[in-house]
UniProtKB/Swiss-Prot annotation:
Coiled coil spans: none
Transmembrane parts of this sequence: 21-41, 61-81, 135-155, 158-178, 242-262, 277-297
One Gene Ontology term, aspect cellular component: plasma membrane
The keyword Transport appears for this protein: yes
Domain notes: The ATP-binding domain (NBD) and the transmembrane domain (TMD) are fused.
Positions of the ABC transporter domain: 336-571
EC number: 7.-.-.-
Self-association state and partner proteins as the record states: Homodimer.
Highest taxon of the lineage: Bacteria
Role description: Part of an ABC transporter complex. Transmembrane domains (TMD) form a pore in the inner membrane and the ATP-binding domain (NBD) is responsible for energy generation.
The name this protein goes by in its record: Putative export ATP-binding/permease protein RBE_0492
Domain ABC transmembrane type-1: 20-303
Amino acid sequence: MNTKLLYRLARNLRFYKKDLIIVIISLLSVSLALLLIGNVFRNLVDQGLVLDRTAAVDKSILYICLLIIILSIASFFRSYFINNVAEKVSSQIRKEAYSNLINYEITEFEELKIGDIISRLTSDIDQISKLIVNFLSFFIRNSVMLVGSIILMFFESFKLASIVIITIPLLLIPIIKFGKHVKALSKKTLESQSLLASDINESFSNIKTIHAFGGQAAKITEFNNLLQDYLTYSAARLKIRALFFAFSMAFIFLGVTLVIWIGALDIVKGNLSSGQIISFIYYAIIAGFSSGGIFELLSEMHLPLAALERIVTIIDKSPIVHNNYSDLKPVNSISLEFKNVNFSYPSRPNLKILNNISFKIDSTQFIGIVGRSGSGKSTLMQLLLRFYVQESGIILVNNQDIALLNPNEIRKLIAYVPQEASIFSGTIKSNIMFGNDSSEEEITEIIKITGIADFTDKIPDGINAKIGEKGVRLSGGQKQRIALARALLRKPQILLLDEAMNALDSQSEQKLLSSIRDIMKGKIVISIAHRISSIESADNILIIDKGAVEAEGTHAHLLKTSDLYRTIYKEVDLL
């Protein structure tokens, strides 16, 4: 058993001391009531049945009824409070894990699968809840009852109790033998469960593509293979646990049978009374079930402990914190500059994306960026947002190196609209307001400017309409208008548009661009364009090729001087 992990869990439990005290008192009450019933059985037999005393029988039955009432009440408090604590602790751990995960550096998510994250934050934490209930409730209760029943057995018969004591340590053999295998299989089971979650998430996120390409059969086969892996590991783990439990129970009750045989011989010889052997058998059965329950829980704990370990790795992996950031100096006009910047993605270190790129953008400029796919256009925005760190070179905002500035302060200056509009489940209004604290008047104005009012006026509930997960009820153009409204409502100093209007027709795009330029006067707009027509009016256009600026200038200038620009223009805009 991993005591370090249990200690980590105990740190979360310390906040619920009052509840745990009630749980412990309830557990002790349950255990004591069950153990006292054995003593009442002895009196019932020896004083009531053997001596034929009706009063003794009635008194014993009354005691048993009272103990059952105590047992029931204590069981209620135990069950309610331990499950309540388990839910609270699980929620607390889930909150810690989520809060830590969402603050990870973007690079960390290149190594994580969304399905794995979902699995850890849901099913793994549910396993932790089971661990709390099983350990604090059943494990402690069984331990108290085992110790208590053994002590009482010694009071009844030292010889018979000694036989029971000898058998219990022998059960450690299968625990040691099977434990390592169960632990390894538990980890494999959780990993295969995460792969299943990842596949489900991937499949239904791309359900339209699967249908369009007739890929249902292939995806079903892939899912079934993953499911078979999960079932294989799960079945192997359950088989070992079942063998262990069967061995344990057989061993325990063979021991109880041996005790009954020897005890019966002692009754014949007059060394034990009938009440003593009945009481002893009762305690022996309690000891048998308690020890069997303990060993069953020990074999079962490997799965929740493996789940706890997977969650702890998320919580313990602290985001990078810097306390020596420089303050961002306020200036009247914003400026931006890349100086000899080189970059490769961490997952593809041998593939150069940006190659010694340099350019400067002054305030009030509308900058267009064009280039072939994979030339590094979007990467420029990723670096400016500090999602990644360049290998060499300097990126300056207001003549300050952004490597020395707090990334959150830089992001406050920027509004970013990616190629695929990021839409959250909720309403149109909640999506527009995401990250913004704006008045109703500002929201009303921005939905008019971005053309959102054109379709919200025609639907029930307007901007308060529910749009489904990832905006499934919206068209591509509607999603992009919402993403643009969110960005403009932020009132940024720098607006980054990464093919942000490619789902709109040319006329709508031009109208929206005109509105954006009016709103962003005196600020910087950088637009990566698929259609050159959308940036023809830009103050300056950068042509990115193989990670460097191949040429720059106005649309008219580049048409005259750049072969690459003319080629792209003909390929895209004149088709």
